[in-house]
A protein has these predicted regions:
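Long, C-terminal-biased catalytic regions of enzyme "large/alpha" subunits
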Residues: 1-146
Length: 146
């Protein structure tokens, strides 16, 4: 697993807004260092590559993304990764917004029916489970997304 996310300056890397898929390519340089390139196919069918994307991102975002990638690679369940991210106390408003976006994206991959600890805020029952990326009470139907 690899998580690639972060805040980037508008003029540092242009990807057309209609591009929703692409590939991240890990390139090992002759000196042993790694760099990551982003490759996508444009509307005309041409392959485009943006080299060295890791140099473009804010270091804080990049480091958190590497940490999340590592715990996913070692098979930490996605719902536990979401809880880990949720527990981060970050000072910067931008990185808190980033944190919420990462949680929202990862929740889409939690298997339906996965139980969560805690009581439903509406009915008080301990019947919370993930459905379609949202935490849902199996007793009363209360649902919280995001």
């Amino acid at each position: 697993y690899e998580i690639f996310t972060g805040k980037i300056e508008d003029d540092a890397m242009y990807i057309p807004p209609k591009i929703t898929k692409g590939n991240i390519i890990k390139v090992r340089e002759e000196d042993g260092t790694k760099r990551y390139d982003f490759q996508y196919t444009d509307r005309y069918g041409y392959t485009n590559t943006i080299g060295g994307i890791s140099r473009l991102f804010d270091e804080s975002f990049w480091n958190y993304a590497k940490l999340i990638s590592g715990v996913l690679r070692y098979h930490m369940p996605i719902e536990k990764v979401v809880a880990l991210i949720d527990g981060l106390h970050l000072d910067d408003e931008n990185i808190n917004t980033w944190k919420n976006g990462v949680k929202r994206a990862l929740k889409q991959y939690i298997e339906d029916g996965t139980r969560s600890k805690g009581k439903c805020p509406q009915c008080g029952q301990e019947q919370m489970a993930y459905q379609n990326g949202c935490l849902t009470c199996l007793s009363c139907g209360y649902s919280k997304c995001g």
